[in-house]
Amino acid sequence: MVNPDMAGDFVGEIAGGMAAGAPQAAGEIAVGMMESNPDMAGDIAGGAAAGNPQVAAGVAMEMVGADPSLVNDIAGGVAEGAPATAGAVVGAMVADNPDVAAGVIDAAMTANPAAAGAVAGGVLAAVPDGDAAVGIMQEVAAANPDAAGAFAGGMALSLIHI
């Protein structure tokens, strides 16, 4: 029997190598991989982000465009596989569709609570309007009260560094 965690790690490594070796085709390749096994969308996105952080947001957004129902899996996979890149990816997702903000932020921070600061910084960079950012923080608090403090702390740190 195949261990699903080992299989996910292996698929992530393949996606990472692909993103590093063929960055211009990384999104298209990741979508093809995801279409053949949607259950591994997070592993694919996380691996691609770890393999080439410069294309992480583009790859993730292309994957979301191909199957919007997997947006939370993709955000969680990036937070798990490449936490430093999670902010840019989740920020791009929120900027593209503010209606998914609470879900993707919650998915990313649930997958890897240590990514909360990066996620908050990415969201703040993508949503510079203070009122909108406060609204997103309220949605995050409602969706995941345990993660709300870490997210708010990450936003505060991001504001200090602006």
Segments (PLM) and residue ranges:
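Fold-core signature of tandem repeat domains
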Residues: F10, I14-A19, A26-M34, A41-A49, ...
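Low-complexity, charged, repeat-rich alpha-helical/coil interaction segments
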Residues: P113, L159-I160
